[in-house]
Amino acid sequence: MAFSTGGNRGPMADINVTPLVDVMLVLLIIFIVTAPIMTYPIAVDLPQRVLNPPPQTTEPPPPIELRIDASNQVFWNNSPTPVAQLQQKMEEVVQADPTNQPELRIDANEDAEYEVMAKVLAAAKNSQMKKIGFMQ
């Protein structure tokens, strides 16, 4: 019995890919078999076609201009208004047409107190005004 020690050949650097191909083919077969089982129908409620035309868009109402001057006086469309009555006025505007509210444009003087501005914003929030803009 003669065994060869391999002398000058060095280590074997080739990878035997046959087991790798066998494993990949088995995984492919498993995937092919299980893929049709994994699909199942999903009930989807599709929207029905409406034959009625869309509602006509109404013209937006004119904006409300709210101005706060340097002496902390509030003007509702250029008429002086106490801060305590702002929420009531805003609620009346919102209740007149909740879906088509006018834009509230606030123009505050840079010397006005923050407290007045905070009260105006709180009144707008409490009356559920949706469109609020700030002017310079």
UniProtKB/Swiss-Prot annotation:
Stated name of the protein: Biopolymer transport protein exbD2
Transmembrane segment boundaries: 24-44
Protein task: Involved in the TonB-dependent energy-dependent transport of various receptor-bound substrates.
Keywords on record: Cell inner membrane, Cell membrane, Membrane, Protein transport, Transmembrane, Transmembrane helix, Transport
Lipid bilayer topology: Single-pass type II membrane protein
Coiled coil: none
Major place of residence: membrane
Molecular function as annotated in GO: transmembrane transporter activity
Quaternary structure and interacting proteins, as annotated: The accessory proteins ExbB and ExbD seem to form a complex with TonB.
A Pfam family annotated for this UniProt entry: ExbD
Family assignment from sequence similarity: Belongs to the ExbD/TolR family.
InterPro entries in UniProt: ExbD
Biological processes annotated in GO: protein transport
Cytoplasmic side: 1-23
